[in-house]
Regions:
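Metallo-beta-lactamase
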Residues: 2-9, 102-130
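Conserved beta-strand hairpin/beta-sheet module of binuclear metal-dependent hydrolase folds
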Residues: 2-67
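Hydrophobic/aromatic beta-strand patches that form the interior of the parallel beta-sheet core
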Residues: 12-14, 46, 76, 102, ...
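Short glycine-/acidic-enriched loop or helix-start segments at secondary-structure transitions
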Residues: 23, 87-88, 113
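Short, low-complexity, polar/charged sequence segments that are solvent-exposed and flexible
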Residues: 31-35, 65-69, 94-97, 120-124
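Active-site metal-binding motif and surrounding structural segment of the metallo-beta-lactamase
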Residues: 43, 54-101
């Protein structure tokens, strides 16, 4: 099991390790891979990316070791491949589907298509700042 790691002051790696995967986008992964997600604590608590759906419980447990997941204010989805976004439905169910989910225009379209859900998307474009 992957444990949360504080990588800088109030910034945590909260992803998961998949020991079983042997091929990732054409690369051999004989020792598995990690699904990276990051929690930033501050005026607003921000989560960047999630993990594959089958690791959702472990992912939420990692977050819970740092803060109550319901205290996450903002979720950012960098891209919609399932190793980054698969746990979004479970996460949003836990933290509250009214919480903003920041992503690109195409990200919102893809996430709607993947999950058949209309989360509280906040579309950002190149050069936008949060």
């Amino acid at each position: 099991m992957y444990k949360p790691i504080e990588i800088a002051d109030r910034i945590y790696s909260v992803g998961c390790r998949d020991w079983d995967i042997r091929d990732f986008h054409g690369y051999s992964t004989y020792e598995g891979t990690t699904y990276n997600a990051f929690l930033i604590l501050g005026e607003k608590n921000i989560l960047i990316d999630t993990v594959k759906e089958k690791f959702a419980d472990e992912f939420l447990s990692n977050i819970s070791k740092i803060i109550d997941p319901k205290k996450i204010d903002i979720v950012i989805s960098n891209h919609t491949e399932m190793d980054h976004s698969g746990a979004i439905p479970r996460l949003m169910q836990v933290i509250g589907e009214e919480k903003p989910l920041y992503c690109s225009k195409m990200g919102a379209k893809n996430l709607k298509s993947h999950f058949n859900r209309d989360f509280n998307f906040k579309v950002v474009g190149s050069g936008d700042e949060l």
